[in-house]
Structures are given as C-alpha cells and as structure tokens.
Amino acid sequence: MMNVMDTLAANAAQTEQRGRVVETSLKAAKAAGAFALRTPVAHGGSWATATVAVELIAAMARGCPSTAWIASTSLVSKNMISFGDYPAHTLDEVFADPDAVAGGVGIPRGHGESGPNGVRLSGRWASVSGCEDAVWASLGAMVDGAFAIVLIPMADLTIDRTWDVAGMSGTGSHSLVADDVLVPFDRVATGERLHYPPDGRTVQTWGVAVLATAVGATLGALDVVDTMFASNRKPFATSYTRMSESPGARHWLAEATTLVRRAERTMLALASRIDAEPGITDLEHAGMQRDRADAAKDCLAAIERMLDLHGASGFAKSNALQRFWRDVSVVSRHPALNPYLAVEGFGRALTESSPLPRPRA
C-alpha cells in the first residue's frame, strides 16, 4: 500500500489543480486493485470485504484524498449493479475490464419511457465523481413511473463540468446529462428485476468507505506534522530550538494523534462488524451511523490542532497540510457522516420511533 500512497502523494497537487486524477495516479490505483473492490469475482474482481476496502481507501487518501474518493464511489457504483437481475451478456460487457472506473448516482434524477427498441432516457445527475475517467455509469431513474437502475456507457452521456468546490477538487465530480438516450432493455433493472433498497450491510459498507477517505486524509495531514516535528522548525517567538521542546506543542500533537487514531479504530471496528454480522438491526444501523459521524468529528478536530501547530504557514498553497484540511472539511460533510442526522436517527431508534424520512424522487 505504501507504493500507491507515495505515487498518489507525489501527484496530489497536480490532481487538484487539474480537477482530475493524473494518469500516473490512476494507473497506480488500478494496479493496487482500487477500482476492482466491488467487481464480481466471476469477472476478475475481488468483491472485497469492508475491512480490505477501507484499509486500501484510507491508505490511498493518506496520499491523495481525491483519488481515494473515486475508489470509494466506484465501489458504490459497481455495488449498485448487483441490485439488478441483468443478463449475463450485459454483465460481461459492463465488467469487461474489472479495473475500470465506474460512476453513478442512485437518486432518480432521470426519466425514461419504454419504446419498441428500449428505454428513451433523459436526465441530469450531479456530483458523479470520476466521471471523466469512468467507462460505465449506474444511474437511478424513473422508468415508466417506477424506480430503475440503468446502466449506460459514459460515451452515451454528456459531462457538464460543474464541480468547483473548495476541497476534493481532484474528484472531478461533475454532472452527467442524458438527452433522449436509447438504453436497451437488458441494461434497465426495475420491478421484479430490481432488489432495492439495499440491505443494511451494504449501506454500512458504503458509509464506512466514505469515512475511510476522511480518516486517511487526516493521517496524511499527521504525516506532514510529524515531518515538521522531526525538522529544525521551532515555535515562533519563543526560545525553544525545536517544536518537540515545547510541552504545549507535545500536548497538542498528542491530542491530534489520539483523535485521528481513535477515528481509525472506529473505522476498522465498523468494517469488522459489517464483515462479521449477517444482518444489521435498525438500532445497530443507527448506532453505526452515529459512530461514523463521531469519527468524522474526530478527524476535523485533529486537523485543527495540526494547523495550530503549523501556524499560518500551514495555509500556504504549497503546503500539503492545507489541502488535507480542505479535503477533510468537505468529505466530512457527506450525508453518510452527517452529525445532526446521525444523532436524530439514533434517538429515533432508541425510542423505537419511525426511521428518518427517505428522500423523495
């Protein structure tokens, strides 16, 4: 994992500036199996456990959070395909390259109607990470009034470059547009051919994959601070000759390290539970969501302490610390890590109230 982390770290600044993962990083990620984590074994993938997936994603995020994020969203997109009873020849086509990047959005932002030769689909799906490097997209849509997951080659879609965000810039999470695209029936799963919504283990796997990027990015920030402590850098306007001479600096470093290591332990514990438990109850689901959100808060708190230690120079655009800070700030606001909804959902589960309202199409 160190090899892929080092390669991604060397290209992280360029990936951010480009708004797209550089080719060298993409090749390294593919070689590490990052985009085959949820490719079926029958098609050359690993269909990895949650533990294996988060360990790899976190290691990648330690070098480049944007590249790691695309690995996590590709996992989700390929996992979505398993919800449909697609013909064998369709799956052979979609998974022809087990290491190909996949993009997708489960929210039904498209509408289609059946015709004699297939479904005519139009729609717009925002925030499709890695779409410029993806080969296939798995997209939620309303087809003939019913929810469906539709598989479409990226070549049949238009990319609207809408992603312009303070952090996670290298993910290239632009919008996909379909304008009266003809989709063969064997690439549309709906009704009895669609097994949806996903089970608790699948939802939790997706959530912990999101957390893995936040944890890995915070560990990457800690690497920057550890390097600073090992250097001749000293606290400004003091008589100390090194950072490590300051009891306050040592205390702040200890707190930052404790926070991120606690988040890492939470991530691994959640992944282990997902792999071990055949089913997840509503109360367990809510508790795991709360734990994810708490771990994300630990990441945010840790990186703030690191910035305190580094001072204003940590915000220099040439300093990797500020990039990790921005990336962690953005990814920790993902719905899977939302703290107030996690608390609300846990409270509902504890009192056996109705679950959180589902989003409307």
Where are these regions (language model features)?
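Glycine-rich phosphate/cofactor-binding loops in nucleotide/flavin-utilizing enzymes
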Residues: 312-361
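Glycine-rich phosphate/pyrophosphate-binding beta-alpha loops
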Residues: 126-131, 206, 331-334
